[in-house]
Amino acid sequence: MRFVIVTGMSGAGKSLVTKYLEDIGFFCVDNLPPALIPKFAEISAQSEGKMEKIALVIDIRGGELLHDLFPALEEVKKSGFSYEILFLEADDDVLVKRYKESRRQHPLAPEGRLLLGIREERKALQTIKSKANYIIDTSTLVTRQLKQEINGIFLEGKIFKGIIINVVSFGFKYGIPTDCDLVFDVRFIPNPYYIAPMKNQTGKDQMVKEFVLNASETKEFISKLDGMLDFLIPNYIKEGKSQLDIGIGCTGGRHRSVAIADEVYRRLEEKMHSVVIEHRDIEKDGKGVGK
């Protein structure tokens, strides 16, 4: 049985995450009093496989009840069940903006002092955050990216090694993704855009893929990138980095970067990393621009 506690800052996306967990088969319960968690775990374990994946949403609305959380989880552990904690985070200014847009009242700001309430909540949740298995900062994530993060951690068949790796292909014509930690420019690789049969294809098509990946420049680049990532990823994990965003760019983001990003994704998956792929500009019309 997989038993997950979902918690974090109000406004950081717990409702969305709950929906995404339900989409991948989790039975979700919102704001269960911590004192009831051990009994709930016991009942879930006796459900004869009907409740194999459980997510409990615990937040500041529980007030003083939050103090009961870790004693309850310790009891769960003593009963032979393991658990994971997912903590959702966001910057203060982002949370303020979200609250103002939604016109909701923060649970710790009854008199409307929103920023003060957010800071009080952050302080109250610090201990829980320090014990979290996974921390996702949603400050700059769009909903699709948040779903990718959740799938990367919780989809069956993937092993979480302490870091989520996002690989994104893009076109320099449309700008470099602002959230990338590593950016690789693959415009030095022979360009299939200028070969008539491949001009209107993408790096997803077999002809383009073979052309790009069979180039001697690509083979050498992939080999060196492989070694670089094998070195970097364990060191990022050691330093506590929980997310790595890798951008691979060509001119228009439809040919070379797509084929190479897919190959990088495939190799990382083979090494059992939690990895997601995005082709940001593959659908964009880049007439007259080499890809």
UniProtKB/Swiss-Prot annotation:
SUPFAM superfamilies per record: P-loop containing nucleoside triphosphate hydrolases
Q: Mind listing the GO molecular function terms for this protein?
A: ATP binding; GTP binding
Pfam families found in the cross-reference section: PapZ_C, RapZ-like_N
Superkingdom in the source lineage: Bacteria
The record's listing under InterPro entries reads: P-loop_NTPase (IPR027417), RapZ-like (IPR005337), RapZ-like_N (IPR053930), RapZ_C (IPR053931)
User: What Gene3D superfamilies would the database entry show?
Assistant: P-loop containing nucleotide triphosphate hydrolases
Q: Which UniProt keywords apply?
A: ATP-binding, GTP-binding, Nucleotide-binding
* List of residues binding GTP: D59, I60, R61, G62
Q: Does the keyword Secreted feature in the UniProt annotation?
A: no
- Entry similarity comment: Belongs to the RapZ-like family.
Role summary: Displays ATPase and GTPase activities.
Report the protein name in the record. Nucleotide-binding protein Ccel_2290
Q: Which organism is it from?
A: Ruminiclostridium cellulolyticum (strain ATCC 35319 / DSM 5812 / JCM 6584 / H10)
